[in-house]
């Protein structure tokens, strides 16, 4: 198994709550683990029950080394967070097409702001790049994606949000308990004051949205002041992000991937396969405008995020490292593209085919059910389009003379629903 395949496997398995931004995962990842009826108790009864839970949680925090005074300050006046309860029970059926996602995530405004941040923090970013071996543009791109360069870091008190999840969630309680304890230990150590410990409804914090456990493992005290302050100290936050990427295997001096052009008659059975770039070149895969690949020996995976009619990409290991930050392909592609644009690059060469609409989760379940009925075994109909579903789609596409790109589109569902 090559190193890149190991990273792809790790990224594919990284479908639980991530290291820093649980609120940015597809919400199904949370709602599968969390269901709570806000109307089950009256507000007064819920608060009373929650207060008992807080007192009952104290021994857990104490045994982890949290001081009693810190615990009291952290929970002073805290009640269950209704926004957290509402959001953790919400499951969006709508799926934004990747071209709409990218248009927002890599907007001209965000690109220009990223270039400004690259200039404003040039000395610090140069030092961070030297220390961790991670491209400064990639670090700035994640900052832009996560909080729009610090303009919105979330408005939830992290202890309140995590306590609500630890109290209300019927599953994954150990996860939420650990995150809450770690947040309390951060307060106890004086890295941030309670009134500044704000983040997402799921507890992701700071400029680049670390979960408390990830803060504990990867945060960096860039300026040596004794605090790892990802909330108000921008260099600390950027260094922490670089450290996270480095620790997950970032390859220094290499890019995340390349937009590529596929030749006429290309064998789409090779989609999702890993080969050296030299091997892809022998199959006729090239870069737009005749540009060369700088390192033909690099391993790369061919992906088609919107099928054969949209842009194609060869993804290198750093792409899968970005996916350890957020496991969505669209997110990692946006980070890579934003980094390139901030560096001075242009938009993608090929336009997106806006007719190639993606499926909602319920539509994906329908497609999986129909494929299974037709004998194209894709496993459980869970609405998640993974490797097994793409293999089944390709087998169906081959059987009816379509390009076997494995893309789960509305048009494909309509065709198979009609019995064709």
Name each model feature, range by range.
Residues 26-39:
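Bacterial N-terminal signal peptides
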Residues 41-46:
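Sec/Tat signal peptide C-region and signal peptidase I cleavage site
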Residues 66-297, 310-313, 321-339, 343-361, ...:
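Catalytic glycan-binding domains that act on GlcNAc-containing polysaccharides
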Residues 359-364, 372-416:
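Short acidic, glycine/serine/threonine-rich helix-capping segments at coil-helix boundaries
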Residues 1-21:
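N-terminal secretory signal peptides that target proteins for export/translocation
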């Amino acid at each position: 198994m090559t190193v890149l395949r190991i990273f792809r496997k790790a990224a594919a398995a990284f479908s639980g709550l991530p290291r820093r931004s649980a609120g940015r995962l597809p919400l199904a990842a949370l709602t599968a683990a969390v269901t709570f009826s806000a109307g089950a108790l009256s507000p007064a009864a819920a608060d009373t029950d929650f207060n008992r839970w807080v007192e009952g949680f104290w021994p857990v925090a104490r045994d982890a080394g949290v001081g009693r005074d810190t615990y009291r300050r952290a929970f002073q006046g805290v009640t269950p967070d209704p926004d957290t309860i509402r959001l953790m029970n919400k499951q969006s059926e709508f799926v934004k097409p990747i071209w709409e996602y990218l248009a927002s995530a890599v907007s001209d405004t965000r690109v220009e702001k990223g270039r400004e941040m690259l200039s404003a923090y040039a000395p610090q970013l140069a030092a961070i790049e030297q220390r961790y071996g991670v491209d400064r543009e990639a670090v700035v791109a994640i900052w832009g994606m996560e909080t729009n360069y610090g303009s919105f870091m979330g408005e939830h008190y992290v202890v309140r949000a995590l306590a609500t999840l630890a109290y209300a969630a019927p599953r994954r309680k150990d996860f939420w308990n650990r995150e809450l304890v770690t947040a309390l230990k951060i307060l106890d150590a004086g890295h941030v004051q309670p009134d500044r410990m704000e983040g997402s409804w799921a507890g992701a914090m700071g400029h680049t949205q670390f979960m408390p456990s990830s803060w504990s493992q990867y945060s960096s005290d860039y300026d040596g002041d004794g605090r790892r302050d990802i909330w108000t100290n921008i260099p600390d936050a950027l260094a922490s992000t670089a450290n996270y990427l480095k620790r997950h295997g970032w390859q220094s001096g290499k890019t995340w991937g390349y937009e590529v052009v596929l030749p006429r008659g290309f064998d789409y059975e090779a989609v999702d396969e890993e080969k050296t770039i030299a091997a892809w070149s022998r199959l006729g895969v090239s870069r737009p405008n005749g540009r060369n690949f700088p390192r033909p020996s690099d391993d790369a995976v061919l992906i088609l995020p919107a099928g054969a009619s949209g842009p194609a990409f060869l993804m290198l290991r750093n792409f899968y490292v970005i996916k350890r930050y957020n496991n969505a392909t669209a997110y990692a592609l946006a980070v890579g593209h934003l980094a390139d644009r901030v560096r001075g690059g242009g938009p993608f060469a090929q336009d997106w085919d806006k007719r190639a609409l993606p499926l909602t989760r319920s539509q994906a379940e329908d497609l999986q059910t129909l494929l299974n009925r037709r004998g194209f075994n894709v496993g459980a109909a869970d609405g998640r389009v993974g490797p097994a579903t793409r293999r089944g789609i390709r087998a169906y596409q081959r059987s009816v003379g379509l390009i076997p790109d494995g893309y789960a589109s509305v048009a494909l569902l309509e065709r198979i629903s009609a019995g064709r």
